[in-house]
Amino acid sequence: EDGRAVPVFNDKHLSFRFDHAQEMVKLSEQLGFPFMAGSSLPVTFRLPSVELPYERPIRDALMVGVGSSDPMDFHALEALHSLIDRRQGGETGVEAVQMIEGDAVWRAGDDGAWSWELLEAALSRSNQLQGISRTEAKPQDLIRNGQLQALVKNPAAYTVWFRDGLKTTMLMLNGAVGDFTCAVRLRDPD
């Protein structure tokens, strides 16, 4: 109670209720401390340690996440944005968002709504594949061995269309992975 204030970082969004979030901001202003919210994933370590070059055109991107809806999909979305916002033209705004769950996710992949190739690339970077990778310490290809659909009981897919034409997909694959991975397909600058 010496009258000093320290900055506060609130992991994820401020609250699931707008009135609670407003109260948190109001208190930070009254008490005079800097207040920020967001995900810590955009600033955590990456394996491999990679940053997309600034101003590179991106064709599409796919993020794989794990965890319950709301807190963990927020982390996946912010981690994805930390990569794609470096693209040519930067952040231009969101045009539309669609979320689907269950078997519709696999059908959407089969129909080309999201890329199995990008999913394969993202899964190849996972340090925490589940199934026999975990129980028997065996490497596996979750897509080709048919285990992906067996391990993931209720997949969720978020597709985000941006105003500059970029389309991204975020797949929440509880049961298949224990970490967050991403794959980005660059567009030829010409």
Task: Report residues per predicted region.
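Internal, well-ordered alpha-helical segments in soluble enzyme and binding-protein domains
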Residues: 20, 24, 57, 76-79
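Short aromatic-enriched loop/helix-cap "lid" or pocket-rim segments at secondary-structure transitions
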Residues: 21-22, 48-50, 108-112
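C-terminal helical cap and adjacent loop that interface with cofactors, partners, or active-site loops
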Residues: 176-190
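Short helix-terminating capping/connector loops at secondary-structure junctions
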Residues: 2-5, 55-56, 89-93
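Solvent-exposed loop/turn segments at secondary-structure junctions
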Residues: 14-16, 41-44, 67-70
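Rossmann-like NAD(P)H-binding beta-loop-alpha module
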Residues: 29-32, 36-61
